[in-house]
Amino acid sequence: MPMLSPHSLKPDTLHLPPGTSEFLGCQRRHTLPASEFRCLTPQDAISVFEIEREAFISVSGTCPLYLDEIRHFLTLCPELSLGWFEEGRLVAFIIGSLWDKERLTQESLTLHRPGGRTAHLHVLAVHRTFRQQGKGSVLLWRYLHHLGSQPAVRRAVLMCEDALVPFYEKFGFQAVGPCAVTVGSLTFMELQCSLRCHAFLRRNSGC
């Protein structure tokens, strides 16, 4: 079998008409889906953390999940996450894990209980340039439908500050009282949502 010399592998210089390179660049960009929803992987962890850090550190001085915890959950239970990508760029995400008790505890912040029937939503965040566009609402609705398609998951639970309770109530969450979990001086309300109605809506929506 003939061998190719290094010189034969070197491409000839290609001369393109003015503007062609910009056109080809646009073509390459448009090979990516304009909008895609998918479960996250450990390879997405850095992008996730960059969005989360900007969204939470400036407001509360802390993050719901740090980078090692993000990788931990995306390794153990990627099916309980959902990311929204625009042309390959992560713009919003939710990360969850399974929990096996009636109410959240301090342990629930870092544990995944494979036998649990409750999906604990640890964090929902939107990239700063995509906020105030309704993306958080769309993503949460899709995420609850996604959970509703998993037979083992019966309900969703989260904790949030009092000001955010009305937002989550629009999606079927109900406040069950103050959360036992505290983060520094921050206190939270605990909310729960049955997934049966979301599973029914998914089956009848054709999604």
UniProtKB/Swiss-Prot annotation:
List where in the cell it is found: Cytoplasm
Annotated Gene Ontology cellular component terms: perinuclear region of cytoplasm
Q: Which family does it belong to?
A: Belongs to the acetyltransferase family. AANAT subfamily.
- InterPro entries noted in UniProt: Acyl_CoA_acyltransferase, GNAT_dom, SNAT-like
The protein's name is Serotonin N-acetyltransferase
Respond yes or no to whether keyword Cell membrane is given for this record. Answer: no
The UniProt keyword set, sorted, is:
Acyltransferase, Biological rhythms, Cytoplasm, Melatonin biosynthesis, Phosphoprotein, Transferase
